[in-house]
Amino acid sequence: MEKQIYLRKSIRRYRGNDIGEAALSVLASWRGWADVYAQGADADCDIQLLGSDAKLGGMYFIKAPRYIAYWGRPTREGRINAGFILEQISLKLTELGVGTCYLGATHISGANPDERGLEPIIIMSCGNPAEPLTRTSTSEFKRKRLDKICDAELNEKMRVILESARLAPSAMNRQPWQFAIEGGRIICCVEYSGLDAFRRLSEIDMGIVMSHILLTARAQCGAAHIEHSQQDALKAPRGTGYVATIVTENL
């Protein structure tokens, strides 16, 4: 999956045929291979696979053979978990030749919380692409420079890890993340908006970017895990809120 970080792009045009059995199997078995960010009740979630006839509404809609609806807790941790899991699914589907696109302004018409209190958090379209599936170069990404999201001195491995973070997709390409480095600790922080809608989307974005960091840190260092540290929260860059710390080993 990690290699797809440097290739994936949002796909907005799809062929009419359904995704193949390999992709359907990946979606059915996601609990067996995807990492989870949240703990406890906030980790409670479901993935619902919808067809092209799904009743969807919202300001921004893409016609696709399939839609992936993430149901989770309507909390900060629940939204971070949504981005964290869905980005892994997106990268895995890209490996299989299936395109995806986050639909942050799309919702399931008439959906209500289920008996566990889970709600649709975000929807992703997916299908066989009717346009190029991947980028040919990282120069095609429209992203902030690395020194705009982290002003620390970086060794080669840490530079590779944060480059994967730099390339992460985000709602309206806002890229609301900032990072501080303490040894092998990557302190992940968010630039919050005053608007609730942007705040919620930024939390999903933080799940996406942290999935990139964790995947790449494990590829570079062999092991990495997520922690929450009050001490690290004090090191958040000015104007940001602390989210979590990704601890790398063998850096």
State where each predicted segment sits.
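Acidic, surface-exposed loops and disordered segments
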Residues: 1-251
